[in-house]
From Swiss-Prot:
It holds the Pfam family LamB_YcsF. Keywords: ATP-binding, Hydrolase, Nucleotide-binding. It catalyses: 5-oxo-L-proline + ATP + 2 H2O = L-glutamate + ADP + phosphate + H(+). Forms a complex composed of PxpA, PxpB and PxpC. Belongs to the LamB/PxpA family. Signal peptide: none annotated. One of its GO terms (molecular function) is 5-oxoprolinase (ATP-hydrolyzing) activity. NCBIfam families: PRK05406.1-1 (NF003812), PRK05406.1-3 (NF003814), PRK05406.1-4 (NF003815), PRK05406.1-5 (NF003816). It comes from the Bacteria. It is an enzyme of class 3 (hydrolase). GO terms for biological process: carbohydrate metabolic process. This is 5-oxoprolinase subunit A.
Amino acid sequence: MKIDLNADLGEGCANDQALLQLVSSANIACGFHAGDAQTMRQSVRWALEYGVAIGAHPSFPDRENFGRTAMQLPPETVYAQVVYQLGALAAIVQVEGGVMQHVKPHGMLYNQAAVDPLLADAIAQAVKAVDPSLRLVGLAGSELIRAGTRVGLVTRQEVFADRHYQPDGTLVPRSQPDALIESDELALSQTLAMVQQHQVQACDGSWVQVQADTVCVHGDGVQALAFARCLRDRFQQEGISVIAQ
């Protein structure tokens, strides 16, 4: 068995380099919610140094709120913004001698695309237009995954080690007090259930079926490094290879 372990990076956190020694894929902020040309370049260089797959992490234009504010933008606007962000990172990756491999939207762009078919389609079309070989990462079972499949992209269904789930398979909003998982043991047990048994226990106690191609540990989370180390150790014990897919 194998699994991809990814982290959102280039967002101004101090643990990026340490995380890159534990994960197999990096989602690099492209300037709309965090990061700039210099942080993008440094993140790319570190990812190449540690052999980590490089992906873009595009967002709504919302630096003030870290990309976590809901926005109702026309699909054509979102399309253009995603193309812009992917192009910026792709150019840096190319200059540094690497290859951009995947795209994972950030924050509210990710969450809204999980349930909004029109927004999801705009993102998928933008990714395909930039490079049809890019993998599109989205919430397992979401509209974004369906949109990517419809336009012919390779998709990767994502699950979260450090977030609680709702009964419909979406994430508990960060505005709620029980949204984040802060216990290593709980993060570990939830992740193993998703990877090995293809299910996750929702906040109401029910079980939701999920496909886990890649597991996210948020780079800005207080427990990010601890979670990543714990997961790597347990995956090794369980005979699960951590590798970008």
